[in-house]
Curated annotation (Swiss-Prot):
Protein name as it appears in the record: Thymidylate kinase
Binding site residues for ATP: G12, V13, D14, G15, A16, G17, K18, S19
Organism taxonomic ancestry: Bacteria, Pseudomonadati, Pseudomonadota, Betaproteobacteria, Burkholderiales
NCBIfam families per record: DTMP_kinase
Keywords (A to Z) from UniProt: ATP-binding, Kinase, Nucleotide biosynthesis, Nucleotide-binding, Transferase
Gene from which the chain derives: tmk
Signal sequence annotation: none
Family named by the database record: Belongs to the thymidylate kinase family.
Length: 208
């Protein structure tokens, strides 16, 4: 029987540097001899990518936004994530359900209970094995976004939205029993990478 793979997620508010480290982590795991699938949310499937376009560009009701996030996630879990894990692959995902707790539950003030109900429906038996939460103060995140591409609908939100989102992420980390590791990504890139390298190697050794 093929051993189950491991499921890694990367989280953080927009501008925290999360996506910068995703490709590096995928390559680091491959360099350790692992078969790795890189994916993202919303997205990861043809249906999910179409929903991503809507979610990042079109104004919509909070409830619609939340349900579309989980619709994309449902397709993603069933068609991509679960099959890859069953094949023994390691999956590295740029955002997962912690993002819904943070952005919709916290930023949009939907609350955790409704997000939890959808989580229980869509993937009751799947949780990441390890989540790295890239964390920066709001002013650092804003400065990074200002230097990037044209901003999407979420990235254009007001400061209060991002403060609530960041606070919700921290609450998730506190209640995660160590699954979520917070990375201070306001530090120099090489310092962050050194910490990640150590923690990735630790995770791989534990899985051996």
């Amino acid at each position: 029987m093929t051993p189950r793979g491991r499921f890694i997620t990367l989280e953080g508010v927009d501008g925290a540097g999360k996506s910068t480290h995703t490709a590096w982590m995928v390559q680091a795991l491959r360099d350790l001899g692992l078969t790795v699938l890189a994916t993202r949310e919303p997205g990861g499937t043809p249906v999910g990518e179409k929903l991503r376009e809507l979610l990042l560009s079109e104004p919509m009701a909070l409830e619609t936004e939340t349900l579309l996030m989980f619709a994309a996630r449902c397709e993603h879990v069933r068609e991509v994530i679960a099959p890859a894990l069953a094949r023994g692959e390691w999956v590295v995902c740029d955002r997962f359900t912690d993002a819904s707790y943070a952005y919709q539950g916290g930023g949009r003030q939907l609350g955790a209970a409704r997000v939890a109900a959808l989580e229980q429906w869509v993937h009751p038996d799947l949780q990441p094995d390890r989540t790295w939460l890239f964390d920066v103060p709001l002013d650092v995140a804003r400065a990074r976004l200002a230097r990037s591409r044209q901003l999407d609908r979420f990235e254009r939100e007001e400061d209060a939205f991002f403060e609530r989102t960041r606070a919700a992420y921290h609450e998730r980390a506190r209640s995660s029993d160590g699954r979520i590791r917070i990375i201070d990504s306001s530090r120099p890139l090489e310092v962050v990478r050194a910490q990640l390298d150590s923690e990735v190697r630790e995770l791989v050794a534990q899985a051996a």
